[in-house]
């Protein structure tokens, strides 16, 4: 949203920080990831629930439901358990397929 420029800039900056630290820490055996949640049911999204209920029903995401905080937690748990030992600097989208919907 153009009304949330500060939020958008901060998120974009995290992408660069992820790549920077992935490169710097790889020699130490430390992998770095960026976890990008999509539409997640939370206090932050509560004010726009009706809007996103409609968008999700209309196919905003291939997985037609709100994301839950536990969806993000499960992704982070997999990373913390070293489930991807030969991967670093990557974006992990937890977004119900939102990023592929325009194929």
Label each region the model flagged.
Residues 1-4, 26-27, 103:
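Active-site "substrate specificity/gating" loop of NAD(P)-dependent dehydrogenases
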Residues 7, 15:
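Catalytic tyrosine of NAD(P)H-dependent dehydrogenase/reductases that use a Tyr as the general acid/base
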Residues 10, 18:
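Active-site helix of classical SDR
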Residues 23-27, 85:
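Alpha-helical segment proximal to the catalytic Tyr-Lys
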Residues 36-47:
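Short, flexible catalytic-loop segment of classical short-chain dehydrogenase/reductase
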Residues 61-72:
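A conserved structural motif in NAD(P)-dependent oxidoreductases
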Residues 72-73, 79:
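Non-catalytic, hydrophobic alpha-helical segments
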Residues 77, 88-103:
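Short C-terminal tail/terminal secondary-structure segment
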């Amino acid at each position: 949203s153009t009304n949330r420029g500060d939020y958008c800039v901060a998120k974009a900056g995290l992408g660069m920080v992820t790549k920077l630290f992935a490169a710097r820490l790889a020699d130490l055996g430390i992998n770095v990831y960026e976890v990008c949640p999509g539409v997640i049911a939370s206090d932050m999204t509560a004010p726009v629930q009706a809007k996103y209920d409609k968008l999700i029903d209309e196919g905003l995401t291939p997985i037609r439901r709100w994301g839950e905080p536990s969806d993000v937690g499960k992704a982070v748990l997999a990373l913390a358990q070293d489930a991807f030992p030969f991967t670093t600097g990557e974006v992990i989208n937890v977004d119900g397929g939102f990023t592929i919907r325009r194929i």
